[in-house]
UniProtKB/Swiss-Prot annotation:
InterPro entries: Ribosomal_uS19, Ribosomal_uS19_bac-type, Ribosomal_uS19_CS, Ribosomal_uS19_SF. Keywords: Ribonucleoprotein, Ribosomal protein, RNA-binding, rRNA-binding. It holds the Pfam family Ribosomal_S19. The lineage of its organism: Bacteria, Pseudomonadati, Campylobacterota, Epsilonproteobacteria, Campylobacterales. It comes from the Bacteria. NCBIfam families: rpsS_bact. This is Small ribosomal subunit protein uS19. Belongs to the universal ribosomal protein uS19 family. GO terms for molecular function: rRNA binding; structural constituent of ribosome. Protein S19 forms a complex with S13 that binds strongly to the 16S ribosomal RNA. GO terms for cellular component: cytoplasm; small ribosomal subunit. GO terms for biological process: ribosomal small subunit assembly; translation. HAMAP family: Ribosomal_uS19.
């Protein structure tokens, strides 16, 4: 079920504070965050976030296409090694 329109999008307060200060100072340094649940807002366009995926931080550059998604959607947490295929024997 989607979030109610009257509530608005969720962004952690500490993350929004860092975004606003980076915008006012024209700072291009990446913002390190563990907040995968925060929604990407138009104020975040052009900022690079280092999003934690459980092991390390994945750099994510926010563009217009990212608005409305969650930060965690751009930092995958699982690595897919592939299904076991059939072994080809030498003839």
């Amino acid at each position: 079920m989607a979030r109610s329109i009257k509530k608005g999008p969720f962004v952690d307060a500490h993350l929004m504070k860092k975004v606003l200060s980076a915008n006012s100072a024209n700072d291009k340094k990446p913002i390190k965050t563990w907040s995968r649940r925060s929604t990407v807002l138009p104020e975040m366009i052009g900022i690079t976030f280092n999003v934690h995926n459980g092991r390390n931080f994945v750099p994510v550059l926010i563009t217009e296409n990212h608005v409305g998604y969650k930060l965690g959607e751009f930092a995958p947490t699982r690595t897919f090694k592939g299904h076991k295929g059939s072994v080809q024997r030498k003839a």
